[in-house]
Swiss-Prot record:
Name of the gene this protein is made from: glsA
Family: Belongs to the glutaminase family.
NCBIfam families in UniProt: Gln_ase (TIGR03814), PRK00971.1-1 (NF002132), PRK00971.1-2 (NF002133)
Reactions performed catalytically: L-glutamine + H2O = L-glutamate + NH4(+)
Descriptive protein name: Glutaminase
E.C. number(s) listed in UniProt: 3.5.1.2
Length: 308
């Protein structure tokens, strides 16, 4: 039976999952992320009618990393016809690590979906072709979505990622060899790493993504962010591809469309009701927040929410 929301529920959930801290591992392949304190834990909710709930470190900003892949897809959907996007990137789960080259080689440079690194790089390549200042445009979009004017990039994280970008560069060059990457590789990589280096809090993320819970409309904006069909499509992609190769396990445990990042954040959507953001930097072997998944599992069980 569904329960009403309040901050006390969120506080209780964080107390239940806090013992998991120490069992995961903070991302260390990006040096600027390796220094993040692993004990951080926060959760926030924004409902479609503008109510906010939070607990723990919900107001502390962190690197959103691959959560940004949803935002870059949203921007691409606003600048490209549907058929142009989906002829360059697929919609299916990969079943492989998010930075895999093997599958990309076998499938002639067409990434399985826009939420693995290869797919997100194709989307960024497309944005480079339509936007005069892709990084500035992303900031404008995110600031409008969350209603906060000082959202920015963490330059240290972006630089750290660029300095350790051999694998992502290899992915881009491999796609270029198949004709599925059209612009200067270092330029597009810089844009991609800056998007990943967006610094936001759980509260800001929940507010940013609430349009996906409301058929593409945000309560605080006059114009729709995307169409109802596009919102449905994005939620479907998040449900099938948003948690790296563990999307099935996450669907089993949590039952919501979601997107994670190696910064420890996860955004999840309850259609017609709310957007949820959690943050705990320690990751499981797939690169998803260990305590974050547990918190979302506790929340959906407590509230009686699931899309299944």
């Amino acid at each position: 039976m569904a329960r009403a929301m309040d901050n006390a529920i969120l506080e209780t959930i964080l107390q239940r999952v806090r013992p998991l801290i120490g069992q995961g591992k903070v991302a260390d392949y990006i040096p600027a992320l390796a220094s993040v304190e692993g004990s951080k834990l926060g959760i926030a909710i924004c409902t479609v009618d503008g109510q906010h709930y939070q607990a723990g470190d919900a107001h502390e900003r962190f690197s959103i990393q691959s959560i940004s892949k949803v935002l870059s897809l949203v921007v691409a959907m606003r600048h490209y016809p549907e058929e142009e996007i989906w002829q360059r990137v697929g919609k299916d789960p990969s079943g492989s690590p998010f930075n895999s080259l093997v599958q990309l080689e076998m499938e002639q440079g067409i990434p399985r979906n826009p939420f693995i690194n290869a797919g997100a790089l194709v989307v960024c390549d497309m944005l480079q072709g339509r936007l005069s200042a892709p990084r500035q445009r992303m900031l404008e979009v995110v600031r409008a979505l969350c209603g906060v004017s000082d959202i920015t990039y963490d330059a240290t994280v972006a630089r750290s990622e660029f300095e350790h970008s051999a694998r992502n560069a290899a992915i881009a060059w491999l796609m270029k060899s198949f004709g599925n990457f059209h612009h200067d590789v270092p330029t597009v990589l810089q844009n991609y790493f800056h998007y990943c280096a967006l610094k936001m809090s759980c509260m800001e993320l929940a507010r940013t993504f609430v349009f996906l819970a409301n058929q593409g409309e945000a309560f605080h904006l006059d114009e729709p962010v995307v169409t109802p069909m596009q919102a449905r499509q994005i939620n479907a992609l998040m449900a099938t591809n948003g948690m790296y190769q563990n999307a099935g396990e996450f669907a089993w445990r949590v039952g919501l469309p979601a997107k994670s990042g190696v910064g420890g954040g996860i955004v999840a959507i309850v259609p017609h009701e709310m957007a949820i953001a959690v943050w705990s930097p320690e990751l499981d072997p797939a690169g998803n927040s260990l305590a974050g998944i547990a918190a979302l599992e506790q929340l959906t069980q407590t509230l009686g929410r699931s899309v299944y």
